Amino acid sequence: MSDESPNYSVQVLERTVLLMDILAQSSGPLSLKDLTARSKLNISTCHRILNDLVIAQFVEHLPGGRYQLGLRLLELGNLVKNRLNIQELAYPQMQELHRKTGETINLSIKQGNDIVYIERCWSGQSGVHVVRPIGGRAPLHLTAVGKLFLADLDAVELLEYVNKTGIPASTSKSVSEFERLKNELAAIHQQGFAIDNEELEEGVRCLAAAIFNEQGRVVAGISLSAPAQRIQYAWSQDLKRAAKDISRELGCFL
């Protein structure tokens, strides 16, 4: 079977998961011999997969030749846990904002070069057609929440994002020039909230405030979307208060 075939890739993945499951179910570290016996894989295959997992830090190779699950799994698990906690903590605040404004309230996180919508309070009365469903994505530089994440980057990371994506426009009002984007990010630092001025969708404006974790890094954003003519910039203060309350529950007291 060719190493490039889909069946081979699936087989390798299944064997990788099998070895990680065996390590997870063990009360202590296991030797290569133990793992080979329990997995029923030949020793060369088992050793090759374990080496790859060690390089990726999913598995730790201990003195004496034994193996145990690595700390990277804990890091990834904490990321998932934080995201679940954010949804649970944010939803009451989102409901209150929706009740007060009557507009669509979104909760989004960063994934790669996009934001992903993970929760929403919406009603037909808001008058905003929801184009991107829960799980939908949008570029960072075209969204209010995305700009919050960009404002959290250092200069090198920001330039890397710009070079990688090319910051293309979606509407005639999109921010697609680097200098203009830097000016907007500087304004976010000063005012504490971000604006999408019909940059993703014509006729829709958004306001957003950042949610921070205990390290003071942006982990999510809460946003309000409304028809352009109906947006009230005073709502930004409500968003900031809600985001601050959620951040405090996540351990951020900045």
Set out the residue ranges of the language-model regions.
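N-terminal helix-turn-helix
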Residues: 1-83, 237, 244-248, 252
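Short loop/turn microsegments at loop-to-beta-strand junctions
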Residues: 8, 64, 105, 183, ...
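Short, structured helix-loop boundary elements
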Residues: 9-13, 32, 66, 70, ...
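Amphipathic alpha-helical regulatory segments at dimerization interfaces
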Residues: 38, 89-100, 191, 245, ...
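A structural signal for short hydrophobic beta-strand segments in well-ordered beta-sheet cores
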Residues: 59-60, 107-108, 211
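Amphipathic alpha-helical effector-binding/dimerization core
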Residues: 65-164
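Cysteine/selenocysteine-centered motifs that mediate thiol-based redox chemistry or coordinate metal-sulfur cofactors
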Residues: 157-162, 166-168, 244-254
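Extended hydrophobic
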Residues: 173-245
